[in-house]
């Protein structure tokens, strides 16, 4: 048992999906996993272990933002021996060519957070995905006929920005979307020499608000990224 996770060692698989929303973790467990068992309910951050196509996998919510995912991901890696972590979550498009319900595979994550500069104040440390996972996920998504974009994202500390034009300017530099967790996850993966990838569904188009989705849709209907995430986990065995 760790500080924030009530599981025993062995209760959690060495590969895991990490949605931000704990109810999305429950949805994945109930709709994709067989024989799923809940291993955590502390702070309402639900976690489950079951099997997917005969492979043992886990899924757990992380909450919103880099401090929250950093707590859970670190404990999963250090205390429970997790080796492969895939974030499945939502993002807002800032690229005019990226639309709602399409997938973004986060090849790299820029950030406006100081979470990494706390360790390296003198320079920028690039946050990158594991290429093997990225390659597998891309080909799985394409084979399934999903519209998929590969590129950088911005991991932001701020959801309601007072200067959205600064974020939108990044879209002109090839940044696909804004989210709130990938940079911290990639940094932890680099520290502990494990594999990590972010797979995002576009839930909001900051260039066209008419494309936005409801809270219920975000929780239960973005199944493409869930399928790609699970298939990537088992293909990585």
From Swiss-Prot:
Give the UniProt entry's GO cellular component terms: cytosol
Q: Which InterPro entries match?
A: DeoD-type (IPR004402), Nucleoside_phosphorylase_CS (IPR018016), Nucleoside_phosphorylase_d (IPR000845), Nucleoside_phosphorylase_sf (IPR035994)
What's a Gene Ontology MF term here?
A: purine-nucleoside phosphorylase activity
Q: Where is this site: Important for catalytic activity?
A: 218
Q: Which UniProt keywords apply?
A: Glycosyltransferase, Transferase
Say yes or no: keyword Glycosyltransferase present.
yes
Question: Highest taxon of the source?
Answer: Bacteria
Q: Does the keyword Hydrolase apply?
A: no
- Give the family this protein belongs to, as stated in its UniProt record: Belongs to the PNP/UDP phosphorylase family.
Protein function: Catalyzes the reversible phosphorolytic breakdown of the N-glycosidic bond in the beta-(deoxy)ribonucleoside molecules, with the formation of the corresponding free purine bases and pentose-1-phosphate.
- List the protein's name: Purine nucleoside phosphorylase DeoD-type
Coding gene? deoD
């Amino acid at each position: 048992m760790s500080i924030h996770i009530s599981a025993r060692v062995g209760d959690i698989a060495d590969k895991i999906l990490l949605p931000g929303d704990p109810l999305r973790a429950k949805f994945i467990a109930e709709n994709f996993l067989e024989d799923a068992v809940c291993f955590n309910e502390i702070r309402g951050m639900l976690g489950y272990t079951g099997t997917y196509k005969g492979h043992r996998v886990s899924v757990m919510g992380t909450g919103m933002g880099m401090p929250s995912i950093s707590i859970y991901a670190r404990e999963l890696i250090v205390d429970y021996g997790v080796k492969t972590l895939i974030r499945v979550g939502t993002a807002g498009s800032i690229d005019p060519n990226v639309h709602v319900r399409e997938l973004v595979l986060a090849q790299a994550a820029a950030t406006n957070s100081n979470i990494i500069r706390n360790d390296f104040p003198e320079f920028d440390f690039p946050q990158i995905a594991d290429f093997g996972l990225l390659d597998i996920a891309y080909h799985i998504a394409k084979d399934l006929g999903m519209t998929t974009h590969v590129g950088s994202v911005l991991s932001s500390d701020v959801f309601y920005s007072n200067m959205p034009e600064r974020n939108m300017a990044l879209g002109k530099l090839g940044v696909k979307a804004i989210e709130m967790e990938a940079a911290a996850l990639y940094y932890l993966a680099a520290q502990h020499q494990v594999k990590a990838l972010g797979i995002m569904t576009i839930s909001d188009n900051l260039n066209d608000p008419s494309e936005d989705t409801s809270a219920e849709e975000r929780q239960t209907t973005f199944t493409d990224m869930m399928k790609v995430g699970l298939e990537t986990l088992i293909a990585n065995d």
